[in-house]
Amino acid sequence: MLKPLGDRVVIRVAKEEEKTVGGIVLASVAKEKPQTGEVIAVGEGRVLENGTKVPMEVKIGDTVMFEKYSGTEVKYEGVEYLIVSAKDIIATVE
């Protein structure tokens, strides 16, 4: 399993829509990049200059929204993930 370092979070990104609400099939260039996904793994948190560790605000299983062009896409054991910094996560979805 992927184990992120520091304040990084591993996210399994939600699938993008293949069709519009009206049923029109979208070309791959016309699709919006998904901005939501499920947290798969979290790092231990950011360490401040004084040595204090800032705890992570998200946990495994959370559904989160993140900034559109953030993170690094990786493929691990045939599954695509996004690794982002905690600061790029903008909300949790309940």
From Swiss-Prot:
PROSITE patterns: CHAPERONINS_CPN10
Pfam families per record: Cpn10
Subcellular location: Cytoplasm
Matches recorded under CDD domains: cpn10
SUPFAM superfamilies: GroES-like
GO cellular component: cytoplasm
Keywords assigned: Chaperone, Cytoplasm
Keyword match Hydrolase: no
A single GO molecular function term of this UniProt record: unfolded protein binding
Transmembrane annotation, as ranges: none
Assembly: Heptamer of 7 subunits arranged in a ring. Interacts with the chaperonin GroEL.
Annotated NCBIfam families: PRK00364.2-2, PRK00364.2-4, PRK00364.2-5
Family: Belongs to the GroES chaperonin family.
Name this protein carries in UniProt: Co-chaperonin GroES
Organism: Enterococcus faecalis (strain ATCC 700802 / V583)
